[in-house]
Amino acid sequence: MSLGAIRIAIMAIFSFVPGLSTINLGLFNITLRGIPVAIIACLFGPIGGTLAGFVWGTFSLIQGLTGRDPSGPVLFQYSPIGFLVTVYVARRLAGFLAGLLYDLIHRFEKRGIISSMVASASVSLFNTVFFLLFYALFFFSRNGTDTNAIVFFATAFASSAANFGVELSVNLVVGSIIVFSLKKGADRLGISF
């Protein structure tokens, strides 16, 4: 129970301290919030990753509805259900699949280097793929007759796809280093996650 509270507190700090987890690029933000999700997914498996993804989705929802994320109010206006699915399902799937990948790879690669790198990078990959899929499903095709909406959503779609490289690189490096270090330290102390 206390580990869960600590994980949520770390994600809250990471989400709401300005400049700590987000690089603002206008309409969309490059988010570094996948890093704690990757770490939790690697340490606590698919269920931990799913719960971390849920927390990430909750904080994304709060930021979207309060205007901290500039795309949130616009997307919510077009489709409240689509907005909820996009922020919750994409992030939960990203956490679950990262934990699953880590567990699968770690069975064959006991040191944890490759498994932590793949799982950390996969959070960005899965989040971006599912985000763009839900985005296209709920928002882009719905407003095909409005020229302004087409331009807005095409720009938002392109910028979201473009920030993927930065998110992937940062998650790969930072997430895997932290996971590998925590695992090694825990092994030396005789602690298992």
Language-model features and meaning:
Residues M1-F193:
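Loop-helix junctions at membrane interfaces
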